[in-house]
Structures are given as C-alpha cells and as structure tokens.
Regions:
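Phosphate/NTP-binding elements of NTP-utilizing enzymes
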Residues: 1-372, 425, 502
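Gly/Thr-rich phosphate-binding beta-strand-loop-beta motif of the actin/hexokinase/Hsp70
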Residues: 362-389
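Conserved luminal/periplasmic juxtamembrane motif of membrane-embedded glycan-processing enzymes
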Residues: 200, 279, 345, 353, ...
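C-terminal nuclease/phosphodiesterase catalytic domains that cleave nucleic-acid phosphodiester bonds
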Residues: 47, 206, 333-337, 451-558
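Generic beta-strand/beta-sheet core signal
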Residues: 87, 133, 171, 179-181, ...
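Mg2+-dependent endonuclease catalytic cores in nucleic-acid-processing enzymes, primarily RNase H-like
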Residues: 5, 11-27, 238-250, 258-259, ...
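Short acidic-glycine loop/turn motifs at beta-strand connectors
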Residues: 170-172, 387-391, 484-485
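A glycine-rich phosphate-binding loop feature that marks nucleotide/adenosyl-phosphate handling sites
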Residues: 164-166, 229-235, 266, 434-439, ...
Length: 558
C-alpha cells in the first residue's frame, strides 16, 4: 500500500477510511474486491428499514471506503488484513453493515479470483461458513433480525437461501450461524468469516476473553488466510479489560513499535479531543460563551457520526446535556471517545488536543532541552527534546529492550545523546541516573560546559529522581497544567502518546503533590517516554525564566 503523499490526520481519525492524499483524493488501496462486493450487495440485498426500506442496499460513502480496505488484497490476491475492528458511535449502522457483509460472505464475490485490466476480481467462496459471535443472544438477534428484510427474493431464489432464527443456509452448502457465550461451540471449527459483535461487552466474567481467544486460534489455523474476523464495537470503558479494550491496546502497541503488525485493521472516528461536554454547565451564565461551546459540541457530534446522517444531532445533544447521563458515558456512546481510567494522569483526549498538525519539525540548530530516562532490561529507555522556542516535544529515540535481545544497547543510546548535542543547541539536560550512572557522568563531563543551565551542582546533566522526588512532582504538576492549558505541543508521536496515557497518579509525602508511575510495578504499560517529556519540559521552563536565557525570543509559559 502506497502511503506517500498523504495529508496529516488529527488524532480523532484512526485508520484509513477518512484519510486523504495531498491531491484531495481519498486514500484507497490499489487492489480491492470491494467494487464487486458492493455491486453484488446492490443487486441482491435490500435496505432493511427507514425511508428507503425495500430499496437496493447501498452503503454510505464512508462504509464503502471501509469495505475497500477490508477487502483490499495484494498483487497475489492475499488479503492485507487478517482481522479488524470497526469502532463507531451508537446508532452509526454497524449491525446493518455487518449483516450485509455476512450475506455477501455467504454467497457473494468475496474470494480473490484474478486481476483483470488492473482490477482485482472476486468470486464466491466455496464452503462459506460465517459465525456471528456474541456474549448474549440479544446481540446476535440484532444481526439475525435484519436478514429476512435484507435478503431479496432474487437472493433467496438464485442462491437457495433458507433463513431461520439463528441459522441461514445456502443451496451451495454455506451457512451463517449465531454463537453466544460458548467457547466450546467455536473450538476447532473452520469458519471463513467471523463477526465479533459489540466487543465492548466481551469480558472475562462472561467468557468473552475465552471466545475471542478461540476465534483468534481459528483464524490462525486457517490455510492461506481462508478465515478472517471483524469486531464491531462502541468505545469501551477503560479498565474493564474488555476485548474491545484489548484490541485498542493492541493497535496502540503496534503504532508505538511495541508489537509486530500481523495484519490488523483498526478503524475509528471520534469527536475532536476539544469537544466540550462537562464544560457547558459552567458556561450557563455566559450566553455568548455557552453558544460557542454548544456549537463546538454540535460540530463534534457531526464529525463523530461520519456519513450516518440519519442520526439526529439535536437528539444526541439533548442526551449529552441530560444531567442523568454521566459525562464519561456520553463521551463513550455519542462521541466515540475512549475516556481515561480513574487514576490516570492525562486523558487521551487531553493529550490529543495538544497535537499540532502543522508543527515545524525539529531542525538542526534548534535550541532545545533534553530529558533522559534509562533502563537496562525491564523498561524502555528514551531521549526526548523540548524546543525552547515553542515548548514542542519530540521523541529523538526510544529503545524497547525486547527488540534488542532483552537488553537496551547502551552504546547506541550513548551515540544518540552525542548526536543530539552535535545537531541541536542543547541548553539544558535532565538525565535520571538509575541504571545509566556511568554514562550520565560521562555526558556531564563531556557536555557540561556547553549547557546554559546546570541540573546538579556536581554533574550538569544529572537528575537523580530517587533524591529529587519533590522536584519531579512539581515538574509533573507543571506539565499537567501545560497540557490542560494547551501551552505544550507535540507532533503526535505514538510512543510518547502511549506512555503519556499509560501513566497513573501516585501520591507523595509533599502535601497535595503527586508523581507518576506505572499502573503496577510489573505492568507492561510503559511510561518512560512520559518521564523524559516531564524532565525535558521542566528544564525548558526553568531555562526560559532564568538569567541564562538571553538574546532569543521564546514563548514563556506559566
């Protein structure tokens, strides 16, 4: 897939469906079976409800673009994606789309045949076996109740369809079956397409985890990519460990370089991070400010609904403003936003709101401060720069020990620090000492004279967090305030984002101050790049207010 020449996308757009090229054209794969699949849907399926009930089924443009990626293939006809997640707000039309896809998988041209005149051509799949899996009968009922209305007379007659409450048969021997809360019913089966319905409710307590594991195993066992699985969900509730949350975490891990992409399509459309909800009540006495905030909420809902124009924006806004509905649930259901867990430090939407799409890249000679946090084998090691001019954060390098035989390559880390000092005008550096003390001492000796600001009286770059807990807690507080006030910016680096949102608050012995840490000591959700960002930003703040800052304009943040 050619990803060159793409426009940058804001954080609320995840996946390829809403991406565009610099030419203004939609970003689409070179080869896809979607054209044949959608033409088949138009010929054989009918709209199940609404003003167009009974007319030929036509997906929205947004749904069509999603289908182009789900059915994208390479030159040899192999699907680009083995599994996927489609996350949209409540009422977007996920069930009708999945019902249409299930019927197409049963009898339509969903298997690659050949390339003709530069276009991939599809053919019906032999022995089609579709499973609609859920953790409750109500969930599968949502999909199966659509089949009688969607299957046209032509479809029933030409393909010999028999539609029952939880089973659909075709004359060719294909079947669509409902599977609920029964991992044993899935074990060892060889389906060709599996729908995981409403995975935000798939929990360990209702066998959701086990079912997802069995489905994943069936997909892995299928020869030549003959089986694929697609999850549909609303935004999940963080901390519940639902399958939807696990899928989201897997996507973030891939983006951050913590995991290998094995063919996962994750597609979501959220309201922008700065869409106000709880803020509206505080503005009630200021009519002008309230109206402006209400317009931003309206715009956020319009963005999140995508092409689902049947969703009434006024009705959704009324539900959001109903004080009986928790703000977190309104954001989850109607804005499709993933909220923060209760003890999290910075919410994803708070961090995303600080991303600047037109941010000037870090360039040679830029005046910066550096933050460093090192580890030998258990945690990551990272080096982050904060540009003095505009408080922009950049991850210079990050090392995952698992990618280096279980141990961070120290000489590589040293070379990166040397390169940073050679490339940029480094005015201050804060480096945690633990597990990298010898190198921190070396950097202090080698570069100390160049620094405008000294981190420690004995070593200009040394910042031992074991002995400076209060200083670090103050820096954490200042960093959080800057994020909330959007006076710190970043380029959307996926590693830094993941580490920022992984960090949780930890109490200290200093009045109301808190520090940050991992969720648990052995948690795999790392925060090292976040620590570096705090150190770099703290050094920047100290520098711009010091007497050492002379002669060059900067934005002073308070």
């Amino acid at each position: 897939v050619d990803e060159s020449g793409l426009l940058p996308v804001p954080p609320h757009v995840i996946g390829p469906t809403w991406r565009k090229r610099t030419s203004g054209e939609w970003y689409l794969p070179e080869y896809t079976l979607a054209d044949d699949v959608v033409n088949w849907m138009f010929a054989y399926l009918t709209q199940p409800s609404g003003p167009r009930a009974g007319e030929p089924f036509i997906p929205t443009f947004e749904q069509f673009r999603f289908l182009t990626w789900w059915y994208a293939v390479d030159e040899s006809g192999r699907f680009l994606y083995r599994n996927g997640t489609l996350r949209r707000l409540k009422g977007w039309g996920k069930d009708p789309l999945l019902a249409a896809m299930s019927l197409a998988e049963l009898s339509g041209p969903v298997a690659f045949s050949h390339v003709e005149k530069g276009k991939a051509v599809g053919t019906p799949r032999a022995s089609a076996w579709i499973q609609v899996a859920a953790v409750s009968q109500d969930q599968t009922r949502n999909t199966f109740s659509l089949f009688p209305a969607m299957a046209s007379r032509r479809l029933r007659e030409e393909y010999g369809l028999e539609i029952h409450r939880t089973l659909v048969y075709s004359e060719a021997g294909g079947v669509i079956e409902a599977v609920t809360s029964s991992p044993l019913a899935l074990e060892g089966k060889r389906p060709t397409f599996v729908v995981l319905n409403e995975t935000q409710w798939w929990l360990e307590s209702n066998a959701g985890h086990e079912m997802a594991g069995v489905i994943s195993g069936n997909v892995d066992k299928a020869a030549y990519g003959a089986c694929r699985s697609l999850s549909i969900c609303n935004a999940h509730r963080p901390g519940e460990e639902s399958v939807a949350e696990r899928d989201y975490e897997a996507y973030l891990a891939i983006q951050a370089g913590e995991a290998v992409d094995n063919g996962m399509l994750y597609d979501s459309l959220e309201a922008p991070a700065d869409t106000p909800v709880s803020e509206l009540a505080a503005l009630a006495e200021d009519p002008e400010a309230y109206a402006e905030a209400l317009n931003r909420l309206r715009r956020g809902v319009e963005i999140a609904r995508g092409d689902a124009e049947w969703l009434d924006v006024d009705t959704i806004i009324s539900s959001i403003l109903d004080i009986r509905n928790p703000v977190t649930e309104s954001r989850r259901k109607f804005l499709n936003q993933v909220n923060a867990v209760e003890d999290s430090w910075i919410a994803p939407r708070e961090w995303d709101a600080c991303r600047e799409l037109s941010l000037r890249p870090l360039e040679k000679g830029d005046r910066v401060t550096l933050g460093f946090d090192g580890s030998k084998s258990n945690d990551w090691t990272a080096l982050v720069a904060c540009r003095v001019e505009d408080s922009a954060l950049f991850v210079l390098r990050a090392w995952n020990p698992e990618r280096h035989g279980g141990e961070v390559p120290r000489e590589d880390v040293h070379a990166a620090v040397v390169s940073a000092f050679a490339t940029y005008d480094v005015v201050a550096m804060r480096a945690d000492v633990k597990e990298f003390e010898a190198y921190v001492d070396l950097w202090g000796e080698r570069f100390g004279r160049k620094l405008k600001l000294k981190s420690d009286a004995k070593n200009p770059v040394r910042f031992d967090m074991r002995g400076r807990k209060k200083d670090f807690a103050l820096a954490v507080e200042a960093f959080y305030d800057a994020v909330v006030e959007r006076t710190v910016v970043h380029d959307g680096n996926p590693i830094l984002r993941r580490h920022i949102v992984n960090a949780v608050r930890r109490p200290t012995n200093y009045e109301d101050l808190y520090t940050i840490g991992k969720a648990t000591k052995d948690s795999k959700r790392k925060i090292d790049a976040a620590v570096c960002a705090v150190l770099a930003f703290g050094a920047r703040q100290e520098f711009v207010t010091s007497k050492k800052n002379r002669g060059r304009g900067v934005v002073i943040l308070k």
